[in-house]
From Swiss-Prot:
Interacts with HscA and stimulates its ATPase activity. Interacts with IscU. GO terms for biological process: [2Fe-2S] cluster assembly; protein complex oligomerization; protein folding. Signal peptide: none annotated. Keywords: Chaperone. This is Co-chaperone protein HscB. It comes from the Bacteria. InterPro entries: DnaJ_domain, HscB, HscB_C_sf, HscB_oligo_C, J_dom_sf. The gene is hscB. The lineage of its organism: Bacteria, Pseudomonadati, Pseudomonadota, Gammaproteobacteria, Enterobacterales. Belongs to the HscB family. One of its GO terms (molecular function) is ATPase activator activity.
Amino acid sequence: MDYFTLFGLPARYQIDTQALSLRFQDLQRQYHPDKFANGTQAQQLAAVQQSATINQAWQTLRHPLTRAEYLLSLHGFDLASEQHTVRDTAFLMEQLTLREELDDIEQSKDDARLESFIKRVQKMFDARLQQMVEQLDNAAWDAAADTVRKLRFLDKLRSSAEQLEEKLLDF
């Protein structure tokens, strides 16, 4: 059973996150291992496994990028384990330039420049995310997979910038 079915949701990117949360709570109550403490060893093991599956499904579907990756996996794109790289040279050059800029910001310890950088990267991420949503809505799986790969780069860059921000604030 796929994660969408487990939560009673249609297998599409845009989901009702409130329904996801409510169903998660229901499933957790229903399959919590403590409820099977007096059961047989097989029942206890099944409850632990079911609870782990529910938690994994919840973590996957509640985050936009992992939800997209999972949806693509249902259509034959295993982005989690693939060695496929982004072939868009202009995008890769842009990423190198942004990484260099982040390194320069770290060296200069320029808070204002870092704040501006984070906002710019967030705008880039949001634009790609919207592009990915449209591609998934239109079942453009190849294009969506490529956009997810690019979003991973931007997500890592954003995370690095936020870590630098925390580091600079600690001084």
